[in-house]
A protein has these predicted regions:
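Class I S-adenosyl-L-methionine-dependent methyltransferase catalytic core
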Residues: 1-224
Length: 224
């Protein structure tokens, strides 16, 4: 992610799911402080390994940022202070589409019930809202699935979870998927002959400023 495409200045702090560490590496290259949290210990170890490199930037003012990683649950970010984060970037599992950590307790990729998954994502949304500074953004990439040869909309349920937490929807960016060689749809699509889901939603939410009059954003907020 080029510097001109990020809303974080070097002193700002970013929070994200550690995953394979790609985003944390970009934060290091850009000089952005970051915290990576993941429920999977293997993912945290991979992220730490990928962060272990020397970097000599062209920018003379570059300073090596503080980047922390730890094993944790997005539903309980107890090591992160309230209103201390400038940007959240996360790519949660899509219910039980692809197992993430092999039956680790608390892993949402093991939750088969879509209703239960949406309920747990509401807890994630509330924690994201708590740790994010007022006026700052939370970006979340989410996709849908198909069961019994029918489309199952996960994204609108998760969208409603974040609006329920108090967020304002700033953007809905459609991410097209190309050459899907490792998704569940690719595994079963040819056998059962159905249309591949070729996109994901990148939702960008904004936390209102303290005392902000949000009535003008009512169409972009919780409406039910």
């Amino acid at each position: 992610m080029p510097a001109e495409h990020t809303c974080l200045r070097p002193p700002d702090a970013r929070l994200g799911m550690a995953g394979s560490g790609t985003t944390l590496v970009e934060c290091k290259l850009l000089g952005r402080r970051a915290v990576g949290v993941d429920i999977n210990p293997d993912a945290v170890m991979v992220a730490r390994n990928r962060l272990d490199f020397a970097y000599t930037p062209l920018d003379a003012e570059y300073k090596v940022p503080e980047i922390r990683t730890y094993i944790g649950d997005a539903r309980s970010l107890d090591l992160i202070e309230s209103e201390s984060v400038d940007l959240i970037a996360t790519h949660p599992p899509y219910a039980s589409i692809i197992p993430y950590s092999h039956d680790r307790e608390g892993d949402l990729s093991n939750v088969h019930s879509i209703a239960e998954f949406a309920e747990e994502m509401t807890k994630v949304a509330l924690e994201c809202f708590r740790v994010l500074k007022p006026g700052k953004h939370c970006a979340m990439l989410m996709g849908d699935t198909r069961r019994n040869k029918h489309f199952v909309p996960i994204t609108p349920r998760v969208l409603m979870s974040f609006l329920e937490a108090g967020f304002i929807l700033r953007e809905d960016i459609i991410k097209l998927q190309w050459k899907m060689k490792s998704t569940r749809e690719k595994w079963f699509g040819k056998k059962y002959d159905f249309y591949l889901i070729g996109h994901e939603h990148l939702y960008v939410f904004r936390k209102p400023e303290a005392g902000e009059k949000v009535t003008k954003f009512r169409e972009s907020m919780k409406w039910w």
